[in-house]
């Protein structure tokens, strides 16, 4: 399962990208773009991320994954094809001579940080409920 190593890297990237102050800053979401060719299982990655995010500013963050399809351009007829199964061939001319133009991505596209005012209000609300 390579998802654990990837989750560790995502957590490190996210933690290094957020400001150090205020100390109680919370991350709401980490948004990823993941290509189908990476062979990442989204549910496994979310599970691993939850483990590595524990006791960090990422602990309550949602891991949003946008799956990027495998797209190739035929070297014979220049048709752009979305690859949906193991048959890596041009949908128009059936050639197997393709250049992959997307599907290998693994990118942290954005990180959403909780608004400090929202955090204060949520803390006040939780104190009142106790």
Swiss-Prot record:
GO MF, one example: nickel cation binding
Zinc listed as a keyword: yes
The keyword Cell division is annotated on this UniProt entry: no
One Pfam short name: HypA
Entry keywords, A to Z: Metal-binding, Nickel, Zinc
Binding-site residues for Zn(2+), renumbered to this chain: 74, 77, 90, 93
Gene Ontology biological-process entries: protein maturation; protein modification process
Gene3D superfamilies per UniProt: 3.30.2320.80
InterPro entries with a match to the protein in the record: Hydgase_Ni_incorp_HypA/HybF_CS (IPR020538), HypA/HybF (IPR000688)
Residues annotated for Ni(2+) binding in this entry: 2
Record function comment: Involved in the maturation of [NiFe] hydrogenases. Required for nickel insertion into the metal center of the hydrogenase.
HAMAP family named among the record's database cross-references: HypA_HybF
Family the entry assigns: Belongs to the HypA/HybF family.
Matches recorded under NCBIfam families: hypA
Name recorded for this polypeptide: Hydrogenase maturation factor HypA
Organism: Desulfatibacillum aliphaticivorans
């Amino acid at each position: 399962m390579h998802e654990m190593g990837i989750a560790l890297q995502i957590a490190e990237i996210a933690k290094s990208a957020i400001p150090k102050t205020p100390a109680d800053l919370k991350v709401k979401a980490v948004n990823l773009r993941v290509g189908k060719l990476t062979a990442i299982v989204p549910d496994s990655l979310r599970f691993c991320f939850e483990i590595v995010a524990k006791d960090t500013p990422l602990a309550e963050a949602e891991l949003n994954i946008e799956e990027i399809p495998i797209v190739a351009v035929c070297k014979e007829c220049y048709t752009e094809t979305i690859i949906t199964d193991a048959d890596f061939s041009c949908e128009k001319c059936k050639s197997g001579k393709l250049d992959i133009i997307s599907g290998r991505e693994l990118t942290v596209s954005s990180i959403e940080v909780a608004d400090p005012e929202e955090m204060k209000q949520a803390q006040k609300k939780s104190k009142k409920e106790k």
